Design a protein with these regions (language model features):
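N-terminal binding-site loop/beta-alpha segment at the start of enzyme catalytic domains
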Residues: 1-84
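A short, charged, and often flexible helix/loop element on the N-terminal side
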Residues: 32-33, 92-97
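Conserved donor sugar-nucleotide recognition element shared by glycan-biosynthetic enzymes
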Residues: 66, 96, 100
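A short, structured active-site edge motif that brings together acidic residues
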Residues: 82-94
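CE4/NodB-like, metal-dependent polysaccharide N-deacetylase domain
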Residues: 100-107
Length: 107
């Protein structure tokens, strides 16, 4: 799936010239229960199909479960990962330079 942001989606131009959508989908509460995983994957894939290219997640959402759901939604979806903006956050105890890099690599 070749995901592109909708042309009518409000966007913000970053200093590097990239256009990032002002509207995205948050994944808080995703990945907390196996019983809702299929529905969560479906929601993310529906968002991709609707042109949503900004996904917000964090290592503390479902203790990493939200990131796993996002990964599952991407696998087999045909979405080109490089077309997405994935915004994440780290635990305060991982907020050092090294901790942040390590948290991103785990994601």
């Amino acid at each position: 799936m070749n995901v592109t942001a909708r042309s009518d989606m409000p966007s913000l131009i970053l200093p590097g010239g990239e256009s990032i959508p002002r509207l995205g989908l948050g994944t808080w509460r995703m990945g907390e229960a196996r019983s809702t995983r299929a529905q969560e994957v479906a929601v993310l894939r529906h968002a991709f199909a609707a042109g949503i290219t900004l996904i917000d997640t964090a290592e503390m959402y479902g203790e990493g479960g939200a990131e796993e759901v996002l990964g599952e939604a991407l696998r087999g979806s045909g979405v080109v990962r490089e077309r997405l903006f994935i915004v994440s956050k780290v635990y305060p105890w991982n907020a050092s330079r090294e901790g942040t890099v390590a948290a991103c690599e785990r994601a």
